[in-house]
Amino acid sequence: MSRPSNTPWLTPYLTVASGRAALDFYQRAFGFKAGHVVDENGVPTHAEMQYKGQIVIMFAPEGAWGSTARTPRSMGVEAPQTFYLYCEDVDALYARATGAGATSIMPPADQFWGDRYCMVEDPDGYRWGFATPLAKAPDAKPTP
C-alpha cells in the first residue's frame, strides 16, 4: 500500500465556513502552508494545509461538492475533538494564534504528562492543542 510522501496515513478533512478565510487564518495563526488548492472562480473549494512538510488538514467550505456538513460554530456546538500538534515554542504559537483571532481556551501551562500545552479555538469552532515537550515531566501523584 502506498501514499504520497508528504501525507500521513490519517488526515482530518474539515468543513469550514469560507475556504479563503480558513486559508488565511491557518497560515497567519498556526504558520501552516497552503498545499494543493482547488480554486473555482476565485473561491477555494478544497485545500490542503501543511506543517513541517506534512499535510495536517484538508478542508472544503460548507456546501462544496454538494456536502451538507457544517462547522461546529455554524451548528452552535462545541467541537467533540481537539487536534494535538507539537510545535517548537508553544508560548510563541499561542501568542501568534490568539493575535490572529483564535479564541483562548487554555493558556500555555506545564502539564503532568510532560508537555507544555495550550488550547485555542479557530473561527470555525475547531479546537487545537499545541504542545512542546518539557525537559522533565512534572512530578505526578499516582492514581489510586
Placement of each model-derived feature along the sequence:
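Vicinal oxygen chelate
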Residues: M1-Y13, L23-E121, A131-P144
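Short acidic-aromatic low-complexity motifs
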Residues: V16-R20
